Amino acid sequence: NYSSATAIRAGAREGKLRAVKKNVPSFVFEDLKSAPPSDAYKDIAVYAALSRPAEEMKKILDCTEGLENRIKAIARGVSGYDELVAKVTTKRYISSRVRRILAAAVLGIDEELVRRSLKNKLYLNVLAANKSRAEELLPVFAHSDFPALLRRSDERNLSPRARECYDVDLFAEDVYAFVTRTPSRGGRTVFV
């Protein structure tokens, strides 16, 4: 019997970690126990819904059929993110779609950026690598069609389109570091 990712996140959010423990690997469970609250992100997401003009929201992928107006109208009268998502959600506008649109509003990701990024070879952003395995991995990355970002100097190998996408990645990392009160890696690979 397995839980869905949504159920696992809900259990962790509600502090029901014992129920989650049997459905995740031990290292994930340890991360969940020490995960910071997401309140700051939720406040930023509501702020983004309030501050972004409807015309700008309309440019977000999947924000169609007047959904931007619904989000903005409801955002004016809610006490927080969870209430906003709940009130915007309908059979037509499922909650995962609403949350994705709010995340895109926070990060400034519009449909054009998504479409351009999907049409281009971007990059391999190596988040972490074991020092003992790095020598095996480096030749693989060297023969890839995508530039591997292992150190800051590798950024110069990015095409203009890839750089545009990478800048959003870095911004997302900075937002995450801010809302979780953790240090930002600045896009650098961590060798462990």
What positions do the PLM features span?
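Active-site cores that bind ATP or allylic diphosphates and position pyrophosphate for catalysis
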Residues: 1-192
